[in-house]
Amino acid sequence: VEPGQSIGEQLAARGIRPQDLDYVLFSHLDPDHIAGISEVRGAKRLLVAEEEYFWSCRVNLRYTSRRLWMDEPPERFWYRVNHIGPESRSYDLFGDDSVHLVHIAGHTEGMFASLIRNGGRYVLLNADGAASPRSWADGTVPGICENSVRAKKALDWIGEMSRDSACAASLCSHDPDAAPQTIEF
């Protein structure tokens, strides 16, 4: 992480303290997504999907980042079966259909994308379901996948959602062309 770019530094630059945060959502537990957990410990709730937690704790040895969160793990939630996403499972964060944590297995078994709705528009935060918009245009799944078939299914869903005229923005965690921005919709 470049100087000034850690989550703690970015929040401080905006005058936001960890205790001001109601939620911190961990899409998955890869080191690059969980390394800043100590900088947001004051948040009211830190959340990760139970399925992601299970696979990272008990099965997948690639998760060398466990030491960052095992002493005080994030709170876990269960996906619910519904009609949303490639796996037809999501977690309705507020119970009002405004924010769904959509199960997009493939890169990891329990990863989610955040689907944020406002009226008839939405923003999709894809985590590592796609590297950039080029990924869904070319059909290129992430380089590291637990399950390439499920990753392709997730990528196809991301592409479909991203091309929808109701999509205000579709953002990927590792897109080199992404820039800090405010999205109003």
Residues of each region from the PLM?
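Metallo-beta-lactamase
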Residues: 1-32, 50-103, 148-167
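Catalytic core of the metallo-beta-lactamase
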Residues: 19, 35, 39-42, 77-133
